[in-house]
Amino acid sequence: MQSILILRVTFKRQFFSDTSRSKSSAGMISTWQSAYKPYLNRLIGVSHKSTLKLNEELLVKILLSYKENTRSRQQCGIALSALARHIKLELPKNWKQLQSGYGIHESNFRKLPSDEEIINSFQLIPNPKWRFVFGLMATYGLRNHEVFFSDLSCLKKGGDKILRVFPNTKTGEHQVWPFHPEWVGLFELENISDTLDLLPVIKTDLKETTLQHIGRRVSEQFRRYKISFTPYDLRHAWAVRTILIGLPNTVAAKMMGHSVSIHTKTYHHWITRRDQQIAVDSALSRVKY
């Protein structure tokens, strides 16, 4: 038990020394808190209750304790494989199969809100500041916390409406275009001035809070206003929107602040369908009836 606790300390030190993981310290803290710490805590808890040593068998036991085809299962696999590399422990050859890939499959996509549902839900929010948050997330596909760490000056009259997300966010600085562009007006995002306090007052000093905690505040407000979908559903819906209009995957991934590989894996179903539709349309255009 003691050795695993010590190992977590050394692994954490190594994690934060690897600057390639994130472009910002706040992003690294958020990633550690949400994507590594919970799984290491479970490892420590299970090892404490059992006689298993830190070996392949124990890591497999932890991985299989999460439901198959879930984000938790996938992230647990990523965290434990990083730990295994740290201590030079060989994992079973079928680890990736056990980890079970996570993506938004067709069944999950059916649960995403339609444009009409998004517009109707906007009207349910009585507080204009939280309504503004909702509109930004729907129009720009932002992560929960990114709303509070973005340059909104682009929304002023005459601005280009291209939002810049600040470097101190989870995946660093990136620019985002609105999809749909007309939602900037529909959600009243351009009614801003230098003196207008647009966003809800929450603690955003990252010396006193975390990106994860800020994100939770947004989720809490969605539940409070009885929005029938989650904040991340708005982000996924934005991604699907860009796919269906034909925006290149590389461009959409950059706007979302993640890698192309994550983008294509997460949205595989819709990307495949788009590419097939393009091929079918091209073939049909050459057929003479």
Q: Where do the language-model regions lie?
A:
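Short, aromatic/basic-rich helix-turn unit that serves as a nucleic-acid recognition element
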Residues: 7-39
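N-terminal DNA-binding recognition helix of tyrosine site-specific recombinases/integrases
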Residues: 35-46, 56-57, 61-99, 143-145
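Basic, Lys/Arg- and aromatic-enriched nucleic-acid-binding interface segment
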Residues: 70-74, 98-144, 148
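Active-site-proximal segment of tyrosine recombinases
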Residues: 146-147, 229-230, 239, 246-258
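Conserved tyrosine-mediated DNA breakage-rejoining catalytic core shared by Y-recombinases
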Residues: 149-187
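Short, polar N-cap/turn motifs at the start of nucleic acid-interacting alpha helices
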Residues: 155-159, 247-266
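Catalytic-site neighborhood detector that most strongly recognizes the C-terminal catalytic loop/helix
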Residues: 168-171, 256-281
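Active-site/catalytic core of tyrosine-dependent DNA strand-transfer enzymes
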Residues: 179-228, 232-233, 238
